Amino acid sequence: MNFDVAVVGSGLAGLTVALHLADHRRVVVISKRTLPEGASDWAQGGIAAVLDSNDSHDEHVDDTLIAGAGLCDEAATRYIVENGRAAIEWLIGHGVPFTRDARAELGFHLTREGGHRHRRIIHAADATGHAVVTTLVDKVRAHPNITLLEDHFAIDLVTDAKLGLPGMRCHGLYVLDCKRGDVKTIIASQTVLATGGAGKVYLYTTNPDTATGDGIAMAWRAGCRVANMEFIQFHPTCLYHPFAKSFLISEAVRGEGGKLVLPDGTRFMPAHDERAELAPRDIVARAIDFEMKKRGLDCVYLDISHQSPAFIQEHFPTILARCLELGIDITRQPIPVVPAAHYTCGGVVTDQLGRTDIAGLYAVGETAYTGLHGANRLASNSLLECMVIGRGAAQDILGQPATAPTPTPIPAWDESRVTDADEEVVVSHNWDELRRMMWNYVGIVRTNKRLERAQHRIALLREEIAEYYANFRVSHDLLELRNLVEAASLIVDSALSRHESRGLHFSRDYPQTLPKALPTVMQPAHRRTSRKH
């Protein structure tokens, strides 16, 4: 299958790239599930941009740099912030139903979130991601130049190195048709990775099941640098229930007087921070983690039951309804909660146009490391980054020839030496073991001893998975596990190499912050030459 551009991933970043290209290029969008599926669709908050005359680019940049704890790239941050309004206007032009406010300058309601000094978050009620993605998916489905491959899983990139040629260029990729079970070869002049983050590497995550670090792992295997993978943002309060994966309990519950308590009803936050339940997100997450590990607890509890049922119904109707479905009446009893992996701040190293170290290969959205998020992401900057870098990547692609010559015929996928898997239990066991180990050893609070144990076990898991991959036909679950163990390895190696505590990385062995902030850049051992930006 031949296309001008292959876009891997169907969240906001991937859809933005595809729609900016489609009038001038033949585009294929590859999604491993049916659309819409991905973290963008789940995003509740909104999109940060300077949309009011009382606000300024300088202040938005400054807020971002403060949150990033010294590791933001200031030039990249300024570029993204300054292009924010144009990105929002593009969405409005496509008909995204943002919440309106007749009194606002632009006519839309702006809210304020932690770390922002002004109201600058444009939103669609409390389901912004869904509103944006649903609108764009309809446009993608209707465009004659876009081919949509749903239930297709990108396996690996086809590069010069894979073809045994000198140079560093990407020529497309191999893709598994998950329904038919066969592997397709997709040839493309440019390939864009927009597969999201790696939250599923942890036992508890707010991310959808698709967040298995696919793009990061593919780019790393192909020879791209990866940066700052130790910085994983954790949300402090995710509902703890076997039938409720990834359901967030909003920080507003604590804002309206909710108290964090142990199983016996004792509050613990005042002992950790004078701001108690209103301390910043990372401090609350660390405190909960400390109490759980110290006491061997599966969860702690968030109690809002002292407020009236009418108050709870008015302020938290969704949380009340979801908990009631699961047999938890939050007007009478506390909510079981755990911290959960929320956002991957690191990723594939790119420039401001999404270009990676390999010619013809781009990375956008949570897959990429542009330098915007540094050591900690500022709320609602992630969807902004998806759109601005996505549009920049599309413009860069449009400035190049539509069809690049393929140097040699790309061979079909070779299944001559593999058989059907007869031990699927190996995949499911390793999947469970990896995620539990990452949660216990590489979580919110880290120690060298735990990290070294994780590193040792990951090395063994990688060997087992590589052997399995070499001997059996690829499957959806096997490919996800292969990518997850790669992402886990990058997180652990990055964490071990940082001898300080900064932003989201907190080490008991190195509690101090060093005077100089330096990014952690991992370089593949097999890389031959580097393309400089």
UniProtKB/Swiss-Prot annotation:
Its cofactor is FAD. Its main location: cytoplasm. Its EC number is 1.4.3.16. One of its GO terms (molecular function) is nucleotide binding. It is found in: Cytoplasm. Pathway: Cofactor biosynthesis; NAD(+) biosynthesis; iminoaspartate from L-aspartate (oxidase route): step 1/1. Pfam families: FAD_binding_2, Succ_DH_flav_C. This is L-aspartate oxidase 1.
